[in-house]
């Protein structure tokens, strides 16, 4: 069932090539760090991806402490949903976005609680229940049906494929170059130190 859902989602994306709606100009990018940072990291992620959750648990806290909080690095989180559950979670994350990564961290830390279900509807139910349990204040149905946010999320994925040939998650782009080493903090730190 999951393979069928993923295949249907990919077909949906292929036929959704609309340009950004005018409203998208006011949708905030989920970021951390100073705009003036010398290094910009773009992280293409799917909220149902286990490796992405591991990045947020094992790599991101050190990256934030050593580079982002010191003004050396700015990170942008871009949506690359791999299935309908991730697509819906991305819409909720973007809708509830205050510009910081806190909603992403909440979704990744509780991923095993909500990223499950035999159907997209069941997974969406788990997502809603999880967010209610975490006291995340969001108009769930309105966010899921927001066309501007839907286009924004889909365009992140389309742009990732076109501009950087993203085909898996997480994919890390550093100053417009794909990071091709194993994604652990040691490798990332070594790479970033060469750019400072």
List each model region and its residues:
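Cysteine-centric redox/oxidoreductase cores and disulfide-bonded domains
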Residues: 81-168, 173-186, 190-196
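Extracytoplasmic thiol/disulfide redox context detector
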Residues: 2-83, 87, 149-163, 194-196
